[in-house]
Structures are given as C-alpha cells and as structure tokens.
Amino acid sequence: MSVAFILLQQLEKSTNIKYTLQKSPIDSRDHVMITKPTVTIYSVNLSSRCPPVFDQGQMGSCTANATACMHYCLQKKSNEFIPSRLYIYYNSRVLQNDVNRDDGATLRVTIASIAKNGVCHETLWPYNPANLYMKPTSNCYTEGATRRISAYASLAIQLAQMKGALQGGFPFVLGILVYSSFVSMSVAMTGNVPIPNPRREQLLGGHAVCVIGYDDSKSAFLVRNSWGSRWGWNGNFWLPYAYATNPNLAFDAWVLYSDNLVASSPNVSVTIPTHPK
C-alpha cells in the first residue's frame, strides 16, 4: 500500500469526522488551576506517558477520547490501563440529558462524569460502535466506583498557565474550533497546523484534544489527536501558541487529579483544589 494512498485515506477520514464538541457554559463554581513555574523550561514532552493513539472513528466521542488519554497519562505506571472511552462518553451524555444521541458533550460534563462514575478498563466496555447507545454493564460501574477522581479544575487559556501545567506533569484537555485548513493534506502529512483564517475558511465545528507538551523553538503545543496513528505526526500535531491561546479559537482547558494518579515536578508550584462532586 503506497504512502500516498494511506494519506488519502487519512485525509478522507478527517473530513468525515463529527466535530461535535460543545463549549461549556460559564460557571462561577468552577475551580481554576494556578501554576507558578520556578525555572524556565523551553520544552516539555509527555508523550512517553501516553496510551497508544486512539481512533474515534465516526463517533462524536472526541471528549471521551481526549479525557481517556489525559487520565492514562497521569496513571501510576505500575498499574496503568486504558480507560473505557464509551463508558466515559455514555455517562457524559447521561449528565447532559442526551444519552440517545451521538451529538458530543462538553469537556466539563465529561470530566464531571469521571468524578461521579469513575473510569473502568476498556476491556470491560470496549470501543465498539455497537456499544454506543448501550448502558455499560454493572461490572463497569462497580469498577468505576473505585476509580473516581478527587479533583478537577479549569485552566486559563493563557500561555504561561498552560505551559506551567505541562511543566508540572499535567497534560490537559482542550477544545478547539476546526477550520478547513486543519483537514488539509499538509496537516495530515506533517502534523503542522496553521492558524486559520476565519474569514476565508469554512468552520467545521469543535473538537476536543489532549495537550501533552510544548516546544518554544516551534512556538507550539504538542497535541495528541484521536484520528489514528497514521494521521499527522504519528497521531499528534503541533498547535501554534497563537491558536491555542486565542479565545476565539480555543476554549475549555481542563486538568484532573486523584490520589491514585501521579503528576509532580520540582520546578513548578501547582494549586488544584478539590472540586465539589
């Protein structure tokens, strides 16, 4: 199979994706993560802590895919497992009163569902389109009850705060608006995402991703997508700082924490309060 054919397949896949991410409404009760870096760090790469690249297929489950990636990155490596994405997606839609539709979710609701129902192994509730509208089994909820998160918080759409979270060992989920340039052959081949021109490009919709690093030499964040490992740069892409910190293009940055998860760095002070369930 030729490289060109593979790239054409990936380009076709990206144009058929459901861009269903919904922006979370403002809630004054949200806690905000505050980071205070103590040294200058020019690049961070947490990809070695990531799971294999997910492929969401034709389901509008980008929030669950991004959040499952974030959760995995924070797990203790002696006891790591892939969280069930459809368990997360189903419970998110329950909280959103939209369980019988594949219309996406907000990132706040997605993370809140983990605080309420926890996560379970994907082996218990596999990522199978046949499971999309089915309630997970009781075994899933039994395990999930032992794997709830104790805290989650929003992260300011500000460069210093976003880089500070990564320096502290915290990957974060992020919502972005996707324009037609994002699904170009160039991006599918290189993973280098341009800053869109909203006046000239078609808005395709919202998409949730997991930010796993940054590089000042590129002025960009390293981001894990959920379109398979053949898309972009081994399933990842570089999102310019100017894109990720523009409130007209990016929104809903969230982090999570739990006693059974690990994220720490001696070079950054992180304040993340317990969030009410």
Task: Pin down the residues of each PLM region.
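Non-catalytic, low-structured ubiquitin/UBL-interacting segments
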Residues: M1-R49
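Predominantly the structural core of cysteine protease catalytic domains
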Residues: S2-K18, Q22, A64, A68-Y72, ...
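General helical secondary-structure elements
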Residues: P25, F81, Y89, E143-G144
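Substrate-binding/charge-relay-adjacent region of secreted/lumenal peptidase catalytic domains
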Residues: D30-K116
